[in-house]
Amino acid sequence: MSARAAWLVQAGCLDYAQVWAWQRQLQDNRRNNPDRPDVLLLLEHPAVYTLGRGSSLAHLKFDPQHPPAPVYRIERGGEVTHHAPGQLVGYPILNLRHHRCDLHWYLRQLEAVLILVLANYGLTGERIEGLTGVWVEGKKLAAIGIQVSRWISLHGFALNVCPDLAGFEAIVPCGISDRAVGSLVEFCPDVRLEVVRSQVAGAFAQTFELDLQPCSLEQLQAEENLTAIAGDP
């Protein structure tokens, strides 16, 4: 069987709220037309905190009325996390009916993608029983949080390549107080985010058996009739 075609959109550092709105539009489009191609968005965000749908404010070390960066409560599972430049974020908008209708399988597949990427650097990415994400030598390098509606996925994964980790000090990342957050640059000082982005795309295509076809952000906006949120330039 030939690999299913999907769109790969690689962008720079984009506003969180705008990308979140686009994700929801992409998900809606696939709920209405399940045969539309899968999409993988790879990008970065300015500093921001996101809370899962059931996240506890107890994991914030700052006053929510005066946050150090914007805070959003979103649809994904999991506790609070932090995004910042230098962290590669991946948002797969997949119709899992074309893959497997199994959320546990999907989470493990996302972990497998990141483990493959880390192997390029001679690092052994590890899973921890009962938790979601990927660790290297006890440090969490990748976080995962998803939402699925009618088997169309939303949100995804974040790999710390070379971000300023100071932003994580203002929270209990993912609600896990006894495990440190780390980044790829700590283990590989010469790592470059654009190289990692390409490696993530390759590992994703391999793991999900997809033919990822480059698609510019402008093409995606036109194909999917994506709209800007109020106040976006």
Swiss-Prot record:
Residue stretches making up the BPL/LPL catalytic domain: 34-212
Annotated substrate binding sites: R76, G77, G78, E79, V80, T81, H82, H83, A143, I144, G145, G156, F157, A158
Localization (cell): Cytoplasm
Molecular function via GO: lipoyl(octanoyl) transferase activity
Record gene name: lipB
Enzyme class: transferase
Alphabetical UniProt keywords: Acyltransferase, Cytoplasm, Transferase
KW Acyltransferase (keyword) present: yes
Protein's recorded name: Octanoyltransferase
One GO-annotated biological process of the protein: protein modification process
Biological source species: Synechococcus elongatus (strain ATCC 33912 / PCC 7942 / FACHB-805)
EC number, as in UniProt: 2.3.1.181
NCBIfam families: lipB, PRK14345.1
Catalytic activity: octanoyl-[ACP] + L-lysyl-[protein] = N(6)-octanoyl-L-lysyl-[protein] + holo-[ACP] + H(+)
Involved pathway(s): Protein modification; protein lipoylation via endogenous pathway; protein N(6)-(lipoyl)lysine from octanoyl-[acyl-carrier-protein]: step 1/2
Residues the record marks as active site: C174
